[in-house]
């Protein structure tokens, strides 16, 4: 599992003022008139929370953010001191007893390095989600036309699984980071196995990330 403590401050600074089109797309699909209960799983830095604050009355949102990196949470707390933060591995998300009406995996789910953990994490997220509500997910499309040339050398040889998904080891700030590049069929399999209805599962318009929207 990726340890962001080694470069939390650098990562946060690199994401400062970065606006994700995918997040804006997700936020457009959320009803501002509802009492929002948000679970942010390993978003990193505070980009999702920041974009929420630009589009919603953040003081009225019950926002719960968990991250494996304690240093990343320290940075986030300085910017949003009144929100709920928990240092927790996403594999243990079932330790949270709250229920949520929107759960986000923004560039986080692709760090899980085996299908058993992917299945189990999604199952646990399903149990935390209120009926008829949604999970929003982005995963890095490392094999897309726009990404492939830059990251092809980081592809781990012979890592292709039965879905034709592949694994990458990418170095940032002298630290290795593992990424799973999903084939959309694997995401579809994981969703249906865990009883989700698939709203969207596709390469986003910018061609950099896959987006997946699932409904309980």
Language model: regions and residue ranges:
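SAM-dependent methyltransferase
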Residues: 136-190
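A short glycine-rich, Lys/Arg-flanked "PGG" loop and its adjoining helix->strand segment in the class I
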Residues: 119-131
């Amino acid at each position: 599992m990726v340890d962001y403590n080694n470069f939390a401050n650098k990562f946060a600074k690199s994401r400062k003022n970065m606006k994700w089109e995918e997040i804006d797309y997700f936020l457009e699909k959320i009803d501002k008139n509802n009492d929002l209960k948000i679970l942010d799983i390993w978003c990193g830095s505070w980009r999702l929370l920041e974009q929420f604050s630009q589009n919603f009355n953040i003081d009225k949102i019950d926002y719960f953010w968990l991250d494996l990196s304690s240093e990343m949470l320290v940075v986030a707390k300085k910017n949003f001191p009144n929100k709920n933060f928990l240092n927790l591995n996403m594999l243990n998300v079932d330790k949270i007893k709250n229920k949520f009406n929107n759960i986000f995996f923004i560039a986080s789910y692709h760090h899980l390095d085996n299908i058993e953990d992917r299945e189990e994490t999604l199952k646990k997220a399903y149990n935390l989600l209120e009926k008829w509500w949604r999970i929003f997910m982005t995963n890095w499309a490392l094999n897309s036309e726009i990404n492939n040339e830059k990251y092809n050398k980081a592809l781990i040889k012979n890592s292709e699984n039965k879905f034709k998904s592949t694994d990458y080891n990418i170095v940032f700030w002298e630290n290795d980071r593992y990424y799973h590049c999903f084939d959309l069929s694997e995401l579809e399999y994981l969703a249906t196995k865990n009883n989700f209805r698939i709203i969207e599962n596709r390469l986003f318009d910018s061609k950099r990330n896959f987006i997946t929207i699932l409904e309980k």
